[in-house]
Amino acid sequence: MDASHTPHDITDRKNAIRSEMRTRLATLTADQRAEWSTAACARLIRSVAFARASRVMLYMPMRSEVDVISVALEAFRLGKSVCVPRVDGSRKTMSAVETTSFDDESMDSDSLGVRAPKVGQEILQEEIDLVIVPGVAFDMHGFRLGRGGGFYDRYLARFSRDTATIGVCFDIQFVEEIPTEPTDIAVHAVVSDRRAVQRDPSHALLAIQDRNHT
């Protein structure tokens, strides 16, 4: 945390960014969301992290988020295991649950109203090779701004460095700087519909095979 800013200042700045993102995202048409989601997912699928992962954790998209279901379907096609978050709002915890389908018969809603498998094996964090992370906003250093619950920060903090973490967003969700606190966790890379940004380009596992930006 920047010593020049109090926790209250940081909360105010985060809330201001959330408000700005709501305004930006509200302008998107369904066609734009679909087109930009397709572009971002194509970059994810081309990443070395995805190619090498045997088990991928990704989120169930909300209307304002990049739709990553095509990444899951490609993972299924390649024989990879897929898991998605299940949140326990009362305990403020997140776990990963394996899924093989996203149809209505297989899915339900967790305590926050986000789709999650009705049944499924809980996957230990050390068994996950790649985590695809949503966010309200990201900066070029890999810091993300979530919705304020802290679920992903607490969950990501327990991963080893060997697990690749990649944020995904629409390009309009990039900001110059996310105000941070000690509990905020940066992802290793961020992928949007227009670019791929790596916090540590020397880490081969996180290299993005980006044909449009060579």
Residue ranges and their predicted role:
Residues A3-S4, S90-T214:
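Conserved phosphate- and dinucleotide-binding cores of soluble alpha/beta proteins
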Residues D2-E127:
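N-terminal active-site beta-alpha-beta segment that forms phosphate/nucleotide-binding
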